[in-house]
Amino acid sequence: MPIWVDADACPVPIREILCRAATRWQIQTTFIANHAISLPPSPHISRRQVPHGFDVADNEIMDQMSKGDLVITQDIPLAAEAIEKGADVFNPRGQAFTKENIRQRLAMRNFMEEMRNAGQVTGGPAPFSQGDRKEFADQLDRWLQRNARK
């Protein structure tokens, strides 16, 4: 049950947590990005650099992942596709995307995009915090305990 990381927007502290977990649990973790990223050497950690372009990294993740894999992404449409294919998905803040909540998350994303395009909303998400880091680490640990030894 490998882990696939949409690494283009993955915060460095989350990459570090994932790398430590990959080594500790000996679980294959692949970071996919359209730019070079720094990762520690490990037989359990790999990176794939894809060309720049719309959804290129997303498409690579979808082509490679399988049912039961874990996908880490902030991209809600990618999360929806991965869930449809049977993956477990959560974002770098540790929030799980599920069959039960993904439609609502997509609707909210689309609504906020419309509001931004209309100039009604100008801000983005809150800055990444220590609490977000802890929530992610806890969520990852729970997933690994359930899935890594299967």
From Swiss-Prot:
Pfam family for this entry, one: DUF188
CDD domains referenced in this protein's UniProt entry, alphabetically: PIN_YqxD-like
InterPro entries, alphabetized: UPF0178
Family: Belongs to the UPF0178 family.
PANTHER family in alphabetical order: UPF0178 PROTEIN YAII
UniProt-listed HAMAP family: UPF0178
Entry protein name: UPF0178 protein Maqu_2186
Lineage, broadest ranks: Bacteria, Pseudomonadati, Pseudomonadota, Gammaproteobacteria, Pseudomonadales
